């Protein structure tokens, strides 16, 4: 399980750890402002804020664990015990894969209010990065597999 902490004393401080027993090749990664970000079910993002964070890079795509953008908006993708839940792609929603969530929010939100607005129309779609890098198990598939 990952842990994050926010400390406020006039300013905001954010930190997190990666409770991992293995090294996945994570490193500090910078996505420069306006470097094209590709999404599976949404248009490419050509114009956006710069991002810095902990990530692994696969196929020239930053798989961010956490980060902060040039406007000071920060977030982390935390791992919680138990299965996740994803949704089918939905018309009229911002269909985002779980691995796209951190760069999507940080690339486009200049405030927490903007991040909340983006999240209100977000649909975390059931999309794997690749056959080798799959999303956390969906609770439906976990239930089905545990009943056998």
PLM region descriptions:
Residues 113-141:
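Active-site periphery "cap/insert" segments of enzyme catalytic domains
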């Amino acid at each position: 399980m990952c842990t994050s902490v926010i400390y406020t004393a006039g300013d905001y401080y954010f930190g997190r750890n990666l409770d991992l027993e293995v090294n996945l090749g994570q490193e500090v990664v910078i996505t420069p402002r306006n470097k094209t970000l590709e999404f599976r079910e949404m248009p490419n993002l050509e114009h956006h804020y710069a991002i810095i964070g902990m990530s692994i890079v696969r196929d020239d795509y930053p798989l961010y664990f956490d980060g902060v953008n040039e406007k000071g908006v920060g977030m982390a993708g935390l791992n919680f015990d138990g299965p996740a839940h994803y949704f089918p792609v939905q018309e009229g929603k911002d269909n985002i894969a779980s691995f796209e969530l951190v760069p999507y929010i940080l690339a486009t939100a200049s405030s927490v209010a903007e991040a909340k607005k983006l999240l209100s129309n977000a649909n975390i779609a059931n999309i794997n990065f690749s056959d080798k890098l799959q999303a956390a198990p969906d609770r439906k598939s976990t239930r089905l597999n545990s009943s056998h």
